[in-house]
């Protein structure tokens, strides 16, 4: 893919990083007031998105689908495959594998946090506070790790096609109706949700909701 560069081949799958991610990382790290904390957040998130995409890729490969590469973008990642799964069951398994990776990591990290005595204030005052203090202690890092995994897992399960949740919805619908009709319904649900998120964001819900609304179009994850 143009403007992306190979950085490794985990499990024999080429991973590429888009130049926009590199520019974004450089800008956020060196322009912000907390370069070490920002770098920790960015590269932890980078690793979690990669694991998310590897979840999709390894399940796809298990079902005989060739994975061409994984490209990491500023707001997500994309596992490029040689074909779309023909079976709704296989498509559902491939789609849900990515979010499940993040949710399992969040659950395991929450257990570890409990062993370290951090359950009493597991999430702290807010996600923003957790991320701002990511390097202050091992428990703070774990809280940030949990928060990022939950955001990735839950965000991707929103049934807004072509995101993972939308693909799972299409796979479920396709078990009882033609594939084309299932796609139209899943896409329609995604458009309604995108409109709702955009309206909420414009009315004061925050920029994050606007990003949710447009990201399935601009930066599809998985």
Labelled PLM ranges:
Residues 1-222:
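Hydrophobic transmembrane alpha-helices and their immediate loop junctions
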């Amino acid at each position: 893919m143009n403007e992306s560069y190979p950085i490794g081949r985990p499990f024999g799958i080429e991973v590429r990083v888009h130049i926009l991610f590199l520019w974004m990382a450089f800008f956020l790290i060196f322009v912000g007031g907390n370069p070490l904390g920002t770098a920790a957040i960015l590269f932890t998130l980078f690793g979690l998105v990669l694991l998310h995409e590897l979840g999709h890729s390894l399940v796809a490969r298990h079902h005989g689908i060739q994975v061409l590469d994984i490209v990491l973008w500023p707001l997500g990642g994309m596992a490029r495959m040689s074909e779309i799964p023909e079976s709704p069951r296989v498509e559902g398994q491939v789609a849900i594998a990515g979010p499940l990776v993040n949710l399992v990591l969040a659950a395991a990290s929450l257990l570890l946090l409990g062993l370290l005595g951090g359950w009493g204030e597991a999430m702290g005052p807010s996600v923003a506070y957790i991320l701002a203090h990511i390097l202050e202690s091992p428990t703070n890092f774990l809280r940030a790790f949990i928060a990022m995994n939950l955001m990735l897992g839950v965000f991707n399960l929103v049934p807004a096609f072509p995101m993972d949740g939308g693909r799972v919805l299409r796979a479920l619908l396709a078990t009882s109706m033609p594939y084309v009709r299932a796609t139209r319904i899943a896409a329609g649900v995604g458009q309604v949700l995108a409109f709702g998120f955009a309206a909420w964001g414009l009315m004061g819900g925050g920029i994050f909701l606007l990003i949710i609304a447009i990201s399935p179009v601009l930066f599809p994850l998985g």
